[in-house]
Amino acid sequence: MELLKNNKRIFPLIGAIIVFILSFSVLYMGDNIGLSDNGDFRRVLLVNNMEYENDSNYYYLFKQDYKMKVEGAGFWDKITYLCESNSEEDIYSSPQFIIIKASKVMNFVANKITSRDETTYNIAYLAFIYILMLSTAAWGIFTFFADEPRKMQIAVFLIFIFIFCDAGYLLYFNSLYGEPLQYVSLMILIALGLLIYKRPTIPKIACFFVALYFFAGSKLANVPYSVIVSVLALSFAYLRKGRLYRIGVLICVILAAVCITNLYMSIPSW
C-alpha cells in the first residue's frame, strides 16, 4: 500500500488498464454492439481493398465481419498488399486508412494463427486499436494529475470513466466512420497538451502534431481548425528556453501545417 501511495506511476497505469478493460467489456461482454452502415462504409471499404461479407449490404444493421482482399506469393507479400490502397478507388486520402490497414494486418496474423480464412476481417481488431489509443490518452491525462492529492486523482479518474467511456462514444469504435478516430485523437491531443504544459519536450510536441494530423484527417471538416491549432501551437516555444528546442517547435509546426494543408487540398468535390 505504501508503494502505491509513493509511486506516482502506478495510478496512471492502473487507471489506463481499467479504461481499456471497461471499454472492451462495453463492446464485447455479452452481445457484440456497434453502429450500422448508413451507406458510407462502402467508400471506405473500396479504398482499402475490402468488401461486404456477402452480396447483401445490410444497410442500417450492425455487421461484425467483412472480407479483405489478400494477394501475394508469401507471408510478407501479403502483408505488403494489405497495407496498400486500391488505386482505382483512391479518390481521397485519410489517416483513418492507416488505422484500418493496421487492423487488417492484425486480422490476417490472427487468421493465420487460428487457421481461419485469411480474408476474414473482424471489426473488433479496429475497435481494439481505438480502445488502445483511448487508454493511452487516459494514461497521459492521469499522469498529468499524478502530483495532485489523491482525492483529485480519483475525481479525474471517475470523470473520465463516466463521461469519456460512455457507451454512446464507444459504439463508434465498432464502425468504419471517422468519428472514433476523431474522438480518440482529440483525447490524445488533450493528454499531450497537458503533458507538454507540465514538461515540454520535442518528442511530446512531435507526437502532439501527429495526433493533430490524425484529428484533421478523421473528418475533413476538421482540417481548417487543425491548421489554426498548429499555428497557435507556436506558443509551445515559450514554455521552455533553448534555441534548439524552439527551432524544433518551429519545424514541427511547419511540417504539421504542410501535411494538414495537403489533406485540405485532397478533399474531393463531393
Task: Indicate residue ranges for each PLM-predicted region.
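Hydrophobic transmembrane helix bundles of membrane-integrated enzymes that assemble
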Residues: 1-31, 96-270
